[in-house]
Regions:
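Short, well-ordered alpha-helical packing segments
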Residues: 69, 84-86, 127, 169, ...
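Short, contiguous, pocket-lining structural segments
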Residues: 114-122, 139-145, 157-168, 172, ...
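C-terminal accessory/tail domains of diverse enzymes
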Residues: 160, 171-181, 209-305
Length: 305
């Protein structure tokens, strides 16, 4: 178990987390999965970073989410995160003609065939390895822009979803490396008339999932609207390049929620509206968001006073 994995230290000055004169940072194991690459008894360990005096390092947002998930445990919050990403070879997205552009968007989303999808072998291996590790991957699909893909993790509680998303991201980068391809989480990897990359975050509390939950979801959407400018600040860097009001986004300067509207900040799924209970989809987080910060923001806004 976790108690068998020792604390560890590292040189924080090499990762821009400390000064060279006081460089030691502490790693405390908090979660682990089977290592699907090395196999046998090897494991991948997620750690929190602490200062030498035992306080959480300023780069450790998990510590705060840990507090919040205890504080709001009675809400039984579930999160499901849709992680979009883009494959590149050098300076070109995977599958794009060198120095040029592919056909306009349309045939690539959930596409099939070598003229429509690029990198499926990496995606399939990533999916298999995540499942082998015990990560709660719930789906994959080719995205709207060629060379862009998505995987989904969850639904899980706030800490579990965040830990598993970071481990799944690490595995994505590591597996793509073997193919000579790099993945990026930049929210707008190609300028112009191309979709950006997001991390749509689906959220529900126990009462939202029960009969009459739609009313509670609507109240939550209103609270998210009141806190839009505060929350958007932790929803990922360069997000303003993606949230333009085009390409299935709402402008970063606006807030709207609606049923089935992919141009809204928050989408209430059609099935949720029809059933009268379910979940909401926050479409604002960028692909490069930190799930610890996003889950904390949603918990505080929706469950707080």
């Amino acid at each position: 178990g976790l108690e068998d994995i020792p604390d560890w230290g590292f040189d924080g000055s090499s990762t821009m987390q400390a000064e060279g004169t006081d460089s030691d940072c502490m790693l405390q194991p908090v979660y682990y999965v089977a290592d699907p690459i090395r196999g046998e008894d090897n494991i991948l360990v997620m750690c929190e970073v602490f200062n030498a005096d035992g306080t959480p390092h300023k780069s450790n947002p998990r510590a705060y989410l840990r507090e919040l998930s205890e504080k709001y445990a009675e809400y039984d919050s579930w999160f499901g995160i849709e992680q979009e990403y883009t494959f590149f070879i050098g300076r070109e997205p995977l599958g794009w003609p060198e120095g040029g552009y592919p056909a306009p968007q349309g045939p690539f989303y959930c596409g099939v065939g070598a003229d429509e999808v690029f990198g499926r072998d990496i995606v399939e291996e990533h999916m298999d390895k995540c499942l082998k590790a015990g990560i709660s991957l719930s789906g994959i699909n080719a995205e709207v822009m060629p060379g862009q893909w998505e995987f989904q993790v969850g639904p899980l509680g706030p800490l579990a979803i965040s830990d598993e998303l970071w481990l799944a991201r690490w595995l994505l980068y590591r597996i793509a490396e073997d193919y000579g391809v790099n993945a990026t989480l930049h929210p707008k990897p190609v300028k112009g008339d191309w979709n950006g990359a997001g991390a749509h975050t689906n959220f529900s509390t126990k009462s939202m999932r029960e009969n009459g939950g739609l009313e509670i979801i609507t109240k939550a959407c209103k609270k998210l609207g009141e806190n839009h400018s505060k929350d958007i600040a932790v929803y990922g860097a360069h997000n303003e390049e993606r949230l333009t009001g085009l390409h299935e986004t709402c402008s970063i300067d606006e807030f709207r929620f609606a049923v089935s509207d992919r141009g809204a900040s928050i989408r209430i799924p059609m099935a949720t509206a029809n059933d009268g209970h379910g979940y909401l989809e926050d479409r604002r987080p960028a692909a490069n968001m930190d799930p610890y910060r996003v889950c904390a923001a949603i918990l505080e806004t929706v469950c707080g006073d």
